[in-house]
């Protein structure tokens, strides 16, 4: 074995350097888009992570941050979950192979989670909405779906009052 080959083999055995565990310790999950109004408009009861079926131009556009979840919701149709009302802008370099910005997108979820969420989504007053969209460590598009209940006006006011009182407490604690 040559000297360079011996160093290479020794480096692998020692376990130093970058390996599979290097990424696991530092998750880099930055959201592409968040539904910021969801916490204000709805009471979030439960959430689950699901995959998204996307076209190539949609993925590239999402990586540029051109995704809006403002009017989006999730519909259950024929035993499948569909993200409806989200807007992924056209990708500039896609040319004639671009996607429809408002098309419904299929969400992928395990059967047990589907049964749990789809069954509860049909209860009165509950709905499914996307809370956050991001790319996983493997580069897959993921959507965090939430089972929510709409807040009344007085509930929203309570939330605002609670938030303001918490801020006041934080300010008082910093002064001491």
Swiss-Prot record:
Keywords: Cytoplasm, RNA-binding
GO molecular function: RNA binding
Gene Ontology BP terms: trans-translation
InterPro entries hit by this protein: SmpB, SsrA-bd_prot, SsrA-bd_prot_CS
Entry GO CC: cytosol
Keyword Ubl conjugation attributed: no
Main localization category: cytoplasm
Region (Disordered): 1-33
SUPFAM superfamilies (UniProt xref): Small protein B (SmpB)
Biased composition (Basic residues): 9-23
Location relative to the cell: Cytoplasm
Its biological purpose: Required for rescue of stalled ribosomes mediated by trans-translation. Binds to transfer-messenger RNA (tmRNA), required for stable association of tmRNA with ribosomes. tmRNA and SmpB together mimic tRNA shape, replacing the anticodon stem-loop with SmpB. tmRNA is encoded by the ssrA gene; the 2 termini fold to resemble tRNA(Ala) and it encodes a 'tag peptide', a short internal open reading frame. During trans-translation Ala-aminoacylated tmRNA acts like a tRNA, entering the A-site of stalled ribosomes, displacing the stalled mRNA.
UniProt family annotation: Belongs to the SmpB family.
Protein name from the UniProt record: SsrA-binding protein
Organism for this UniProt entry: Rhodopirellula baltica (strain DSM 10527 / NCIMB 13988 / SH1)
Name of the gene: smpB
């Amino acid at each position: 074995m040559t000297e360079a080959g011996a160093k290479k083999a020794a480096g692998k055995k020692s376990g130093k350097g970058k390996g599979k565990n290097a990424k696991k310790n530092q998750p880099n999950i930055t959201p592409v888009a968040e539904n910021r109004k969801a916490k204000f408009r709805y009471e979030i009861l439960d959430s689950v992570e699901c995959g998204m079926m996307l076209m190539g131009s949609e993925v590239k556009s999402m990586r540029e941050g051109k995704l809006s979840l403002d009017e989006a919701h999730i519909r259950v149709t024929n035993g499948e979950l569909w993200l409806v009302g989200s807007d992924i802008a056209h990708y500039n370099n896609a040319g004639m192979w671009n996607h429809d910005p408002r098309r419904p997108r299929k969400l992928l979820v395990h059967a047990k989670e589907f049964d749990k969420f789809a069954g509860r989504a049909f209860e009165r007053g509950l709905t499914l909405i996307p809370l956050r969209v991001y790319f996983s460590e493997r580069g897959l598009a993921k959507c965090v779906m939430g089972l929510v209940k709409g807040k009344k006006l007085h509930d929203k006011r309570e939330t605002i009052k609670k938030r303001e009182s918490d801020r006041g407490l934080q300010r008082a604690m910093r002064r001491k």
